[in-house]
């Protein structure tokens, strides 16, 4: 195509919606969300459907040792490094139907549009579905893109277990997605990840397209408290070593941390287990998680230092022992400025109001960015809601983002 009409091409918005709805039917929940935990039977069905669509497009389909699915469309100069885009099909428990899936199926629609209009690209174009982005079944998140980028070890990843002790590597084998191709990076000219914002800013400011300049740092910790279980009736309040009460105080310290430290810091306790979890037994053991995020790596580290000291002091005061593990840490990712600007300029050319911003959520682009120039394309989340069943994005915004990706 000539430069003068390069922006005339458009994706088929109705077809994109149809694809999203078909995938959303896999693992659909009663309240309108989805539950497709990584490597579950539901995730497998979504993968199978994606592969069938890629094969219909006559793409070169490859599955690597971490179950990442790649579909490659040849370019006129096929030895050049490809442009790659994608996201993930796994979900949170009772999660939303747009998170991740929009990025995979948005790129699928781009591939279909290129075929429909017989567009020949100079470079090859690759679509990818990353395994276990969410980390809700196998912790940590983004583990497969991390292995692909060389940041995480393959054997270590295979050894990650879910709550029932099932290992990630065994599940890959069970569902037939432990591929023969090595899970390692290959030359990529540019990577674009299309995603819902998962926050309120675009909607609040009346923008259709977001162009993140990067992704905040993410730090995950696991806190294990051990007190003394006992019968609730005969045991006096004085002298109890209640692990759950200690955890409750600690959780309030986590909530107070951002107010104390300032900046853009956020801190969350999202998971907790109480043992023996009986109404007439004083809790003896508690495990909970801490998630700390900030655009400033140093602020997040300093915040953890402050919090850790407080947690240790609280445990001692409550007569409980405590063990703390740092289970995952990813530094701030700053995207390629030229690619970020390209997203903004393309949105402007398509008459979509846009905004340069920061991503507060983690994405596979964080690891891919360590290997090749990367950027993301955001569209608004209605009410800023995500990782929940009521997660929604307007269909016209889904189409708008896919058109930015196309160009």
Regions found by a protein language model. Name each.
Residues 2-40:
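N-terminal capping segment at the start of a domain
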Residues 16-29, 86-87, 353-404:
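Zn-dependent metallopeptidase/amidohydrolase metal-coordination segment
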Residues 28-74:
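A non-catalytic alpha/beta surface segment that caps or lines the substrate-entry region
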Residues 36-38, 268-277, 289-295, 321-340, ...:
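A short beta-alpha structural unit
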Residues 57, 69-102, 107, 231:
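Catalytic-core environment of secreted peptidases
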Residues 93-164:
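A generic, well-ordered mixed alpha/beta core segment in the N-terminal half of proteins
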Residues 133, 137-298:
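Midchain, well-structured core segments that form catalytic/ion-binding scaffolds
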Residues 231, 235-261, 306-309, 379-407:
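His/Asp/Glu-rich mid-to-C-terminal helical/loop segments that flank catalytic regions of hydrolases
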């Amino acid at each position: 195509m000539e430069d003068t009409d390069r922006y005339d091409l458009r994706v088929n918005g109705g077809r994109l919606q149809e694809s999203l709805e078909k995938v959303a039917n896999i693992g659909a929940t009663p309240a309108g969300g989805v539950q497709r935990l990584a490597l579950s039977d539901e995730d497998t069905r979504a993968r199978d459907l994606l592969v069938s669509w890629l094969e219909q497009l006559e793409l070169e389909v490859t599955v690597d040792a971490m179950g990442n699915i790649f579909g490659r469309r040849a370019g006129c100069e096929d030895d050049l490094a490809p442009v790659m885009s994608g996201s993930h099909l796994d979900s949170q428990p009772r999660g939303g139907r747009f998170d991740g899936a929009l990025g995979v199926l948005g790129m699928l629609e781009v591939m279909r549009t290129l075929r429909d209009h017989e567009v020949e690209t100079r470079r090859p174009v690759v679509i990818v579905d990353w395994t276990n982005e969410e980390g809700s079944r196998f912790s940590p998140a983004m583990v497969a893109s991390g292995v692909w980028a060389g940041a995480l070890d393959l054997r270590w990843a295979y050894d990650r277990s879910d709550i029932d002790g099932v290992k990630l590597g065994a599940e890959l084998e069970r569902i037939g997605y432990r591929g023969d191709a090595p899970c390692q990076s290959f030359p990529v000219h540019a990577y674009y990840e299309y995603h819902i914002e998962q926050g309120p800013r675009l909607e609040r400011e009346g923008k259709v397209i977001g162009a993140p300049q990067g992704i905040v740092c993410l730090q995950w910790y696991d806190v294990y408290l051990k007190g003394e279980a006992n019968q609730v009736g005969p045991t006096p309040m004085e002298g109890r070593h209640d692990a759950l009460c200690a955890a409750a105080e600690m959780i309030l310290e986590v909530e107070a941390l951002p107010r104390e430290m300032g900046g853009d810091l956020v801190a969350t306790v999202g998971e907790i287990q109480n043992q023996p979890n009986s109404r007439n037994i004083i809790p003896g053991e508690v495990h909970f998680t801490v998630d700390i995020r900030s655009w400033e790596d140093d602020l997040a580290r300093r915040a953890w230092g402050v919090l850790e000291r407080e947690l240790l002091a609280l445990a001692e005061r409550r007569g409980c022992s405590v063990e703390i593990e740092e289970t995952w840490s990813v530094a701030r990712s700053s995207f390629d400025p030229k690619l970020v600007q390209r997203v903004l300029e393309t949105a402007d050319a398509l008459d979509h109001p846009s905004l340069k911003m920061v991503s507060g959520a983690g994405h596979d682009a964080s690891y891919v960015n360590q290997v090749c120039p990367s950027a993301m394309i955001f569209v608004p989340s209605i009410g800023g809601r995500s990782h929940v069943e009521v997660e929604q994005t307007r269909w016209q915004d889904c189409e708008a983002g896919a058109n930015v990706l196309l160009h």
